[in-house]
Amino acid sequence: MEGENSSIEKGLLLIRKEESANTTPFLVFTTFIIVSASFSFGVALGHTAGTMASIMEDLDLSITQFSVFGSLLTFGGMIGALFSATIADSFGCKMTLWITEVFCISGWLAIALAKNIIWLDLGRFFVGIGVGLLSYVVPVYIAEITPKTVRGTFTFSNQLLQNCGVATAYYLGNFMSWRIIALIGILPCLIQLVGLFFVPESPRWLAKEGRDEECEVVLQKLRGDEADIVKETQEILISVEASANISMRSLFKKKYTHQLTIGIGLMLLQQLSGSAGLGYYTGSVFDLAGFPSRIGMTVLSIVVVPKAILGLILVERWGRRPLLMVM
């Protein structure tokens, strides 16, 4: 028994050593650069929540004009998401993020400097296209550079940064100019724009393009000089080869109907719940309910990030299906 316990302890130590070896400083830095613009995504979601009255007053907008302005983030997001996979497959995740920043930075600048409804709407639409691209490429990029042992935690950083952005917009909307908040939305985009010069392309995309040597070099850099990447490299190459003959049409085969219905249904029902609209006009909802919007927005800004962390903990403990049933 003593020898058996010793073997188990050694095995656990090896697993922990492997996990810690996989999480290198360069991997953490690369992930930070990739998810940094997710903060801007969150700011975009919360930008109108506490600034509706001041935007309407400054630019003399009607309720209808402001409603169009708010909805353009969603319309732009639909267009960005529609082309995100094609752009990422053709040019790589890194180039897609550069394209994203062109839309996000120009969009935020147009909002911050807007003197009329045209520039305001154009800016919101451009930011929408940017966050539509982000919503696909960021989680995919992270998943393709991280090892399996820490993939879930690293991918969660995308959602965490989004919630941090929402919380920031909610809180600052109580006392700060909507133009300044728009400029704050640019800061993480600039961090990503510069940081992308120092991070590698996705190893999987490099393998798909037939650049196997570059794939190995990038993977070695991400995992550390002493890490054995032979097995992981082979897994990537096999995966790329297997997916080469899979087309979008394959998803609509009868055997995938159940999975496809669940996947699309969950995403569709999430949007039809009205959560996006509620997020855009949270301050107004509080006012109409007779509750001080400043207090409500402040409380929400405090709750948003912890609830995201709680969600991760509950998912890890109980799984996704029970939580969806409770919701």
Curated annotation (Swiss-Prot):
It holds the Pfam family Sugar_tr. The chain crosses the membrane at residues 26-46, 68-88, 102-122, 125-145, 152-172, 180-200, 260-280, 295-315. InterPro entries: MFS_dom (IPR020846), MFS_sugar_transport-like (IPR005828), MFS_trans_sf (IPR036259), MFS_Trehalose_Transporter (IPR050549), Sugar/inositol_transpt (IPR003663), Sugar_transporter_CS (IPR005829). Belongs to the major facilitator superfamily. Sugar transporter (TC 2.A.1.1) family. It is a multi-pass membrane protein. Keywords: Membrane, Sugar transport, Transmembrane, Transmembrane helix, Transport. GO terms for cellular component: membrane. PANTHER family: PTHR48021, SUGAR TRANSPORTER ERD6-LIKE 9. The keyword Cell membrane does not apply. Gene3D superfamilies: MFS general substrate transporter like domains (1.20.1250.20). Signal peptide: none annotated. Sugar transporter. The keyword rRNA-binding does not apply. This is Sugar transporter ERD6-like 9. One of its GO terms (molecular function) is transmembrane transporter activity. It is found in: Membrane.
